[in-house]
């Protein structure tokens, strides 16, 4: 016997597990574009409010994961309450465990690959079920819910989770480009940036039914015309409100986006030559952001698990009573503008401050602990991921050998050794830089938007690279040639 394998536990449920079939033939470039765009649009249009919630004026339990939502496409009190987190986390965690040989799986065998994909899907669905019921019984959706209400909320959130999982699988199975979850997440982050700047949705922010626009620019315009604020007061509010997007955070987010865009072009070019034809020289680029945004995603995945576990203990067990022994040890949640559940010390050590000045004056230690956590986890992940994801120095050296390529001035047997001097350093340095940008942005009070824009920009560039390669290989007959006016298009 080969022993127990974790992937084997999904075998009994394979007949009832929903699955997207592989396409019968390779899809044309234009079809993949359509599938990719519509997958993102369908997810965006799925942000329906939950049905069956008590019509309370003010929720008793506010949002404990407000600073994590922007990274995983989560929308509070909608069908997308937990967004893409279960899908992204299940893929990252299980692939990491498989690469570290914690999970026994042979990716060279098709049946093992299929079982692993099914395990990833089941793990994501189970997370949707667990998260839904944690929030239900913690009182996030209201107190004293009836059995019908509990069942209805479960049906909506778990059903939406299964739908989201299958929607991402459509892209993963070859109907679109790259990773389905990453593509959808990139679309959501881009949309959120527009909504945070120009959103007209009115959100209640006070006890007296006072509302403000979600978009920072729209809020400025309304503030200048408001009867409840002076001209100067409207401008100040537009730049410094800490419970909804403001112009200061919008400017910082755009600055971070520009920096990440620039970092995408930073690379080391290694001179290479062909071993099959003389005089054929070129360069092999190794990007600074070698592992992309995955290091930041991993750090925030671990943060999500930590804060959900803390939420269970503080809210579900201790009922958020400051006098309870659990709250004395872990801290409790404080209400911020009837929207956010802000953790207190010591849980606040692993949560970014809601504003820079509040962080400096009330929780200065957070800058050290939060930054250290993001940096250490990101660097550790990048170092492990580059070694197990098929892009290590040894893997690249094997690709060179298969393609008849070698480093200029180096023997073929020394290629892996030379690449090993560059690739791990690039992966770790890139992860360090992205983590540092993230913690600086979050320390300024961006509430997850810094991490979100880092993930969105890096994910967008990865998608663009995949589309570009696909277009060069099979996009010659694409209808986009005619639209873009490419010379020689039919």
Curated annotation (Swiss-Prot):
Gene label: SSH1
GO terms for biological process, alphabetical: post-translational protein targeting to membrane, translocation; SRP-dependent cotranslational protein targeting to membrane; SRP-dependent cotranslational protein targeting to membrane, translocation
Primary location class: endoplasmic reticulum
PROSITE patterns found in the cross-reference section: SECY_1 (PS00755)
Compartment list: Endoplasmic reticulum membrane
Record-given protein name: Sec sixty-one protein homolog
PANTHER family linked to this entry: SECY/SEC61-ALPHA FAMILY MEMBER
Cytoplasmic topological domain: 1-32, 143-146, 196-242, 315-339, 383-421, 471-490
Cited Gene3D superfamilies: SecY subunit domain
Annotated keywords: Endoplasmic reticulum, Membrane, Protein transport, Translocation, Transmembrane, Transmembrane helix, Transport
Protein's membrane topology: Multi-pass membrane protein
InterPro entries: SecY/SEC61-alpha, SecY_CS, SecY_dom_sf, Translocon_Sec61/SecY_plug_dom
């Amino acid at each position: 016997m080969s022993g127990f394998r974790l992937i084997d536990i999904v075998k009994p449920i394979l007949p009832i597990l929903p699955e997207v079939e592989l396409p019968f033939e390779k899809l044309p470039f234009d079809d993949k574009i359509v599938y990719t765009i519509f997958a993102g649009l369908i997810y965006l249009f799925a942000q329906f409010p939950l049905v069956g919630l008590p019509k309370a004026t003010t929720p008793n339990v506010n949002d404990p994961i407000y600073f994590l939502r922007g990274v995983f496409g989560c929308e509070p009190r909608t069908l997308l309450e937990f967004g893409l987190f279960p899908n992204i986390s299940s893929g990252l965690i299980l692939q990491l465990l498989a690469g570290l040989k914690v999970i026994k799986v042979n990716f060279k065998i098709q049946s093992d690959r299929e079982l692993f994909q099914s395990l990833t899907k089941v793990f994501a669905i189970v997370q949707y079920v667990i998260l839904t019921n944690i929030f239900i019984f913690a009182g996030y959706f209201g107190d004293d819910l009836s059995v019908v209400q509990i069942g209805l909320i479960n049906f909506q959130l778990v059903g939406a989770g299964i739908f989201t999982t299958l929607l991402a699988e459509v892209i993963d199975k070859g109907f679109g480009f790259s990773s389905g979850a990453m593509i959808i997440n990139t679309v959501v982050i881009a949309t959120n940036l527009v909504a945070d700047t120009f959103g007209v949705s009115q959100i209640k922010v006070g006890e007296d039914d006072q509302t403000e626009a979600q978009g920072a620019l729209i809020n400025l315009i309304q503030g200048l015309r408001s009867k409840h604020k002076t001209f100067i007061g409207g401008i100040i509010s537009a730049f410094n409100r800490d419970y909804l997007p403001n112009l200061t955070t919008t400017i910082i987010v755009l600055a971070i986006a520009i920096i990440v865009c620039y970092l995408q072009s930073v690379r080391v070019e290694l001179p290479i030559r062909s071993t099959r034809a003389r005089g054929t020289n070129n360069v092999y680029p190794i990007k600074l952001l070698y592992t992309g945004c995955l290091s930041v995603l991993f750090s925030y995945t671990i943060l999500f698990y930590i804060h959900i576990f803390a939420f269970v203990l503080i809210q579900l067990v201790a009922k958020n009573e400051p006098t309870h022994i659990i709250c004395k040890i872990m801290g409790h949640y404080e209400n911020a503008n009837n929207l956010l559940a802000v953790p207190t010390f010591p849980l606040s050590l692993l949560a970014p401050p809601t504003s820079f000045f509040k962080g400096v004056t009330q929780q200065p230690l957070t800058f050290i602990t939060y930054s250290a956590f993001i940096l250490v986890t990101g660097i550790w992940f990048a170092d492990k991921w580059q070694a197990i994801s098929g892009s290590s120095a040894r893997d690249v050296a094997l690709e060179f050998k298969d393609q008849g390529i070698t480093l200029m001035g180096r023997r073929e047997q020394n290629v892996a050794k030379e690449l090993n001097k560059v690739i791990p350093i690039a992966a770790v340095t890139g992860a360090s830089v992205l983590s540092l940008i993230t913690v600086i942005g979050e320390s300024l009070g961006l509430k997850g938007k810094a991490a979100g824009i880092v993930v969105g920009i890096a994910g967008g560039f990865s998608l663009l690279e995949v589309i570009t390669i696909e277009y060069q290989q099979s996009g010659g007959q694409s209808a986009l040639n005619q639209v873009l006016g490419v010379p020689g298009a039919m």
